Amino acid sequence: MPQHELRTRQLRGLAHRLGLEFQAEDTYDLPAQLADFRLFRKGSRHRASNIMRKQDELISFDARIFDYRYVKWAGNHVKRYQQTVFFLQSTQLGLPELWLRPETIMHKIGELFGRRDIDFVRFPKFSGQYRLTGEDEIFIRHHFTDEVLNYFTIEKGWSLEGIGYYLILYKKNRLFSPRDIEYFYKKGIEVFRMLADK
């Protein structure tokens, strides 16, 4: 059995065990629906698959985990990216537009040329590990409570984007194995609960 078919089969079984809906193929063109997020504007040939979904009865909570692939061209060469994405829509969220990602040496060099991010004096480890950007700094600081900052200080390597009632969480170019999907789902729910309006 080809590897992608085996993955689909394993994820279908996992979704059933967790009480999640499962759809092997994306019939709704998720990447186009999520194009407000930066991740889904990168590259070309965007494709979502193996979509697992959980909704509450009032549809005030809609969470999905899916495989996402796209390609980027560099001259005559193509680089393929794939990652597992957690997407959540909820009226309990009211997020400013924000982008959190691991900070690299290129980001630090960029700061020398005025490309600043949002740092937290009381959480230097967080500020050293992550680059947090967005237009409304005051509103972003309101949502990044001590609980959130502590969480991401311990949890390294995540990328998070938020816009209004929507958020996505992923690790760049990391396709979670079927045995790690439940862990990833729980991480997504934890982040949602921390960022939700109290």
Predicted regions and their residues:
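Charged, low-complexity intrinsically disordered regions
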Residues: 8-198
